[in-house]
A protein has these predicted regions:
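Carboxylate-rich helix-loop segments that flank metal/cofactor sites and access channels
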Residues: 101-113
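Helix-adjacent hinge/juxtasegments
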Residues: 64-104
């Protein structure tokens, strides 16, 4: 994978997150926090997990190993979640714009929140981050339908089509 391909994926990720957040803006607080049969309990919980995972992988990429995820309290409201996820996406963008091919092929050592040490190739960590976020955006889209809201599509091909004249 080239640095330009990485940047394309992270531009896409920020675009898709913004579309996801736009889909949430019509929700009232009750529907945002309503318990649903889902991995993370609610739209808020799933969004908090998505953002916290992006943050912890960014920290690992930077050479840090936080021992816990961001608290869900940072995502108490849609406005708080919007600000925090946008901030994380800006930090991710700043990080990936400085990468070259040698960086992408290098390894990062880190320790998980469970205390397990790992070492991965940087580009694999970046791909995991993108894949993980896509997976949970899909979950949020499904949860939005459960609370009678309409999610915006966040497919990569839609982003790529929007770039073409």
């Amino acid at each position: 994978m080239t640095p330009e391909e990485v940047r394309t994926l992270f531009k896409y990720n920020a675009w898709a997150n913004e579309r996801l957040l736009s889909s949430l803006r019509s929700l009232d607080p009750e529907r945002f926090a309503r318990y649903l049969k889902a991995s993370h309990g609610s739209i808020r919980g799933t969004l908090a997990h998505l953002a916290a995972a992006e943050w912890i992988w960014l920290e690992r990429l930077r050479g840090h190993s936080p021992d816990q995820l961001l608290p869900e309290a940072e995502f108490e409201t849609i406005e708080m979640a919007t600000r925090r996820l946008a901030e994380i996406d800006r930090e991710l963008w700043d990080y990936v714009t400085g990468l070259n091919e040698t960086d992408l092929e290098g390894r990062r050592d880190y320790v998980t929140t469970e205390g397990k040490p790992y070492s991965n190739v940087l580009q694999d960590m970046l791909l995991h981050l993108i894949n993980h976020s896509s997976y949970h955006r899909g979950q949020v889209a499904s949860l939005l339908r459960q609370v009678e809201a309409t999610p915006l599509a966040t497919d990569l091909i839609l982003y790529l089509r929007a770039l073409s004249p």
